[in-house]
Amino acid sequence: MSTPHHQFESKSSTAIRRRLSSSVSSKQRPNIMTTTFASLTPMWAGVAGTLVNNNTQYEIAVTVHDGVYSTDFASVIIPVTPGDTVKNSKDIEAQVLNLIRKFSAEHLCKFLGAGITLALLKECPNLCTRLWLDMDIVPIVFNIKPFHTDSVTRPNIKHRISSTTGSYVPSGSETPTVYVEASHLGDPSHLSPNAAQKLPIPRTLDEQSDSAARKCLMYFGPNNNPRLSIGARNPVTVDAGGKIHLIDDLEEYRMTVGAGTWNAVIKLADELREKKVKIGFFSSTPQGGGVALMRHALIRFLTALDVDVAWYVPNPSPQVFRTTKNNHNILQGVAAPDLRLTQEAKDAFDAWILKNGLRWTAEGGPLAPGGVDVVFIDDPQMPGLIPLIKKVRPEVPIVYRSHIEIRNDLVHVAWSPQEEVWKYLWNNIQLADLFISHPVSKFVPSDVPTEKLALLGAATDWLDGLNKDLDPWDSPFYMGEFRPRGSHLNRGEFRSLCAKEKMHELNWPARDYIVQVARFDPSKGIPNVVDSYYKFRNLLRTRSPDMDESEHPQLLICGHGAVDDPDASIIYDQIMALVNSDPYKEYAHDIVVMRLPPSDELLNAMMANSRIALQLSTREGFEVKVSEALHTGKPVIACRTGGIPLQIQHGKSGYLTTPGEKDAVAGHFYDFYTDEALYRKMSDFARTHVSNEVGTVGNAAAWLYLAVMYSRGEKIKPNGAWINDFFREETGEPYKEGETKLPRTKLDMQG
């Protein structure tokens, strides 16, 4: 039983609570009632704890911060059992969550982040995991001392110290404690003097929690998202260099996969730790797009396993990123026919990669002698590094990972733009020891030797902000509730963004909506999405005339931008012009097109609250967004492009169509929306039939396997086989009957 030591003193307004609350029901689904609040106020917290009364009780302090100043404080004292660390940890965890939940419910607020003292984390090791998964709070850990310390210290103090090649850079020296004469303190009996017989100034628990709250706020940037952190020589210091603790409990990762995959991961990670193998990833951008998402999740997981891994990005160059995006579009065959890779662009590209590469090959850099032992290079932005690495460290194995479609039918057409770009890139890529492609037919030019070719799908993280289950309290914070224009109330993150851009709004939860989450890219088939929706609305009018149009679902097209994607604004403008032209403008008020800020939870809420998910790409890589939708139980209607057919079981978890079959897409819309039994059947199947291979843990095993084999000095010759099959065999964990995996259909990789 907890003993109140100090209760929260602020009182919530009943009038405001009544004004903000609402219950929404749907005419089509009258038994479903959703109670929401029009707005939740963003807040931050600081949490500290310490043992008291001869270690028989534990005091917990929570400070509430509104982003400007600390506004409230509470503390409780709970009994603990000396020696029973498991029970004590669970009791402390429950009290912290209860205090924060109680304040949230009474004051209609949403805690975005919480500063946690290192002393509290030691007593309650899984507290951060529970804050993240159960309450959608970003926990940031600080070594807040119980004594006052000198503020004049070297910056970038961290409580975690790792190797210079790891993802966590070393911290500075410890902040020195401030000592004073013993006579200046009231009761010095519990304090230990220093060599000069001076005593430290105690810092009370409320001061510690307040300090944690203020420090936490410093790690949030625009749109209240955690700041991206890049270190010296451009390592991406994932999770603020280890201060952000999303998942401390490895058991959470284990529960996302089957026993075979997990056992394989542990065996491979153990060998790499024992050998102290250092792994380095190199890609073009730290944020935006699927590669960056995968790398953040991968580094987070491998660091939790104590594998020495780091991820590096170059200094950005808008000029070069325009060139790399052009190259991407040319290789996929979606660029203008007259677009060419000029010699001037090649020279600028080469100079840019050389400048960045020299920083990494210089003494102390990750590619210098003594640096990483295995190099993984992502996509056609970075292959210029390969000859430089081979020159400086010829013994280091290099793996090139291609995430995009390379039109095999075009790259070998003499004098074509595709041949020109591919020859330029292949000149460097051919020096790599391994070429990894998505498992999709005709994705690899015939120049690539089959013995060097390996297959690996893309991945997503089931525990990050993009995919974790959002609590019913948190989801409306991102979605908001529909309010008439002119309302002065904060209407939730997404609605506020729509209002800011004067975009039509979703009338959720009163109305369903269909969603396509994708970058604004010429290959994503967005015009086909708009046309299919138009045809679907006409079907509802003719086949279901009794259904009021206010009950027809809306359409949401949304996605993040990427640092290296200059096309997004151009495509966005084209889509808006299309929506407002004949014949589509009739339904323009029900079509919402939004470029969203880099908030994973925002995209999560958009997908989780939708009725149906789309992916009508005309050209595609793997597109793991499909598996993300299936994982939430959303049936997916998609095109047979790239790796999409590997993820959808046609007629069971969704429908596959040929690009441009808009009437077929509209028909599937109609079936899903009017046949509840069909929808539920497919939804349940989708939720339970997603392969381990597309999750972070299964994907990580593939990278661990390659690092292990190269560390043994073995030469890998996959001959076009799946890396997942190799690591399961190597670790003695074969696939079991009935285990869900991506189909191993015969592929014609090189056309």
Curated annotation (Swiss-Prot):
Induction comment from the UniProt entry of this chain: By heat stress, cold stress and salt stress.
Enzyme Commission numbers on file: 2.4.1.231
Gene Ontology process terms (BP): glucose 6-phosphate metabolic process; glucose metabolic process; trehalose metabolic process
Enzymatic reactions: alpha,alpha-trehalose + phosphate = alpha-D-glucose + alpha-D-glucose 1-phosphate
pH dependence per the entry: Optimum pH for phosphorolysis of trehalose is 6.7. Stable between pH 6.0 and 7.0.
Gene Ontology terms for molecular function: alpha,alpha-trehalose phosphorylase (configuration-retaining) activity
Keyword Glycosyltransferase: yes
Region (Disordered): 1-28
Enzyme class: transferase
Database matches in InterPro entries: Glyco_trans_1, Trehalose_Metab_GTase, TreT_GT1
Keywords assigned: Carbohydrate metabolism, Glucose metabolism, Glycosyltransferase, Transferase
Signal peptide: none
Family: Belongs to the glycosyltransferase group 1 family. Glycosyltransferase 4 subfamily.
Record function comment: Reversibly catalyzes the synthesis and degradation of trehalose from glucose and alpha-D-glucose 1-phosphate. The equilibrium lies in the direction of trehalose synthesis.
Self-association and partners: Homodimer.
Record protein name field: Trehalose phosphorylase
Organism field: Pleurotus sajor-caju (Oyster mushroom)
